[in-house]
Amino acid sequence: WKMNDGKIRFQVSSNIPEETPLMFTLRGKEYTAQCKSVAGNRISISEWFSDRGNPMKNGFYTIDVSCPIYSVLPEKIKKIFGERNRNICGQYVKFEPVGGNTIHFSYGLVLKNSKVQVIDMQQRISAL
């Protein structure tokens, strides 16, 4: 993540193939915003998130990063991922009965005075 003038942007390091479409979704109390991105060479970067052009309000947010279902992926990515994304596996791969495997992970964020504390939502509560 990176903060600038109260706005926030996210950067994800992964082995997701280049040109794979990704969706960044930021949610908070009375706040939801999304942006589309495309996986780069081991790094994917979101657009800047703001509160309608203003600095983000203090509070708890979640950032979700996900990959669309098989049917809407580019042909190049479909060949790599396989039918219904059967070739992908890992900690952040979830099976969906309708679309097959999808990539999805979440982190919690506490924003306070332009400072960010990140919480791994995959961790067990006892590990925090």
Q: What are the residue ranges of the model-derived segments?
A:
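Serine/threonine-biased, Pro/acidic-interspersed low-complexity stretches characteristic
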Residues: 1-30, 37-40, 45-128
